[in-house]
Amino acid sequence: KSSLPEGLLTAIALNESGLHAYALNLRGRAYFPDNRAEAARLLRAAGGRGMAGCFQINAGVHVARGDDWPLDPEKAADWAASYLAQHYETYGDWGRAVMRWHGASSQRAGTQIICRVHSKLEVAAPGSKLFADRCRPGAPQWARGRRNGAAHLEVAEAED
């Protein structure tokens, strides 16, 4: 994880799930179970297909059937760091790695996801210059994303 830019993993988790360890997206519907057992039950009921955990890992693609490791924040963070680093090595660009993370299918969609992550990065690592050249901090959606990220981070820190 140390080879990633400061705050990037936290910014991605803020963007993907609001740092909710058991968040699920099953067939386009969001679920926020109270515990891992309930989240695992819902994921199994969906046939192991869906986005799971604080990083919203695509369980149908990256997870063996019946396994629920994306619901373990530490395992998910280790996997996410490795996945991002692998794509950074391939592309030589953290923006492209984030686009690949999210599966952005176009440059426009890629820029949108990069800017959403950038707005959360301003909360996770204030003053970070990562992606600053790609996003307009004055845009309303950027400010909204930053406020949203700050609120989620405050709640997560209060629960620790």
Tell me what each language-model feature is.
Residues K1-W142:
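Catalytic glycan-binding domains that act on GlcNAc-containing polysaccharides
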Residues R146-D160:
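Long, low-complexity, intrinsically disordered segments
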